[in-house]
Amino acid sequence: MAFLLGCEKVRVDFPTKEVFSEVSLGVDEGDRVGIVGRNGDGKSTLLNLLAGTLEPDEGRVLRNGAVRVGVLGQADSLDPAATVGQAVVGDLPEYEWAGDARIRDIIAGLAGDIPWDAQVGTLSGGQRRRVDLVRLLIGDWDVLALDEPTNHLDVRAITWLADHLK
């Protein structure tokens, strides 16, 4: 399997503490990696480091060429004034995304019961999480970095997501 991304002997410091040090990790094509630990142990920091949104204080992050990393953070960055449709597909014409069975299946699986023209700011936390997941999952990524992806999800959505990620 081909190497996609990783890190070697990285250290990350915050102003009041060392988050972690001497961490090394490699992710190959087809890998499924779970990062577990207590609150505040640096799981989100490690994901951000691997995704390229944070630089280490020491060590190095490795990427195979232009590997595309899709990131789902703990909190969404959806525009509350946008409609669900705008948040999910942006300005992409309907004939482009609606003609793709994969995209239609993801929308139906996670957001089929959410009105397409509803404003994101009017949605519940679980609905917002599902919209953010749809936005991410319809993308074309080499690596998905999901930070607590089941937060705010009901059992049906968790089951759908687990089946989809198999």
Question: Which ranges hold each PLM region?
Answer:
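ABC ATP-binding cassette signature C-motif
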Residues: M1-K166
